[in-house]
Amino acid sequence: MNVSVPLPSGGTMTEPDFSVLRQSMIAEIAAKTAFVSTQLGKAVLDPRVMNAMAKVPRHEFVLLELRPYAYADTPLPSCFDKTISQPFIVAVMTDLLELRPTDTVLEIGTGLGYQTAILAELAQHVYSIEIIEEMAVQARQRLARHGYTNVDIKIGNGCGGWPEHAPFDKVIVTAAPDLIPPPLIYQLKPGGKMVIPAGLPNDQQLILVEKDASDAVSTRDILPVRFSLLEDAEPG
């Protein structure tokens, strides 16, 4: 299943170098998707998601010293003891949302903006909440530099959602509470989907939440995962 991601032998990396690494990342995501096809219910992710992953320059959304490793399929350290998610998990979470070009999306946990950029490629508008001010500022700068004008970021605790812009077609959460915050379910439109990691630190699951036309809510565990805890949502 493993597809090796070549790293440069030395010297300054160029855009063509990053492009080659990005294509290797895409191949590894495809291989891992096939490997967990039973859990995902599919062996191939939506081509629109894969195209977005192939387009967005992940090296522009990681710390400068980690750029050579931007396309390795692994989480990377970010600011303030946070991490940027593994590309495979980014792709799976995005695919589970089944985004449409007309969708408005609520993202909890902007980080440095990589997942936000993927969402912005596929949806009409992204409303993203980041609790750490410096990370929110950096994300705004990075997203603006790459022309993403369909994103609004606010600084705050994402557990309460963003009522002023609710309801949302889709919700994605990039840090894990022990339980799904009720406001995020309330702010999901009928027919909407939410993807969220949840559970105790050593027992987290990636969960797909669906709300039907009558507001009935169902959940499905997808994969075991390990995420940073959602701020102000520690266990207990």
UniProtKB/Swiss-Prot annotation:
Its EC number is 2.1.1.77. GO terms for molecular function: protein-L-isoaspartate (D-aspartate) O-methyltransferase activity. It is found in: Cytoplasm. The keyword Nuclease does not apply. GO terms for biological process: methylation; protein modification process; protein repair. The gene is pcm1. The keyword S-adenosyl-L-methionine applies. Catalyzes the methyl esterification of L-isoaspartyl residues in peptides and proteins that result from spontaneous decomposition of normal L-aspartyl and L-asparaginyl residues. It plays a role in the repair and/or degradation of damaged proteins. Pfam families: PCMT. It catalyses: [protein]-L-isoaspartate + S-adenosyl-L-methionine = [protein]-L-isoaspartate alpha-methyl ester + S-adenosyl-L-homocysteine. It comes from the Bacteria. This is Protein-L-isoaspartate O-methyltransferase 1. The active site is at 85.
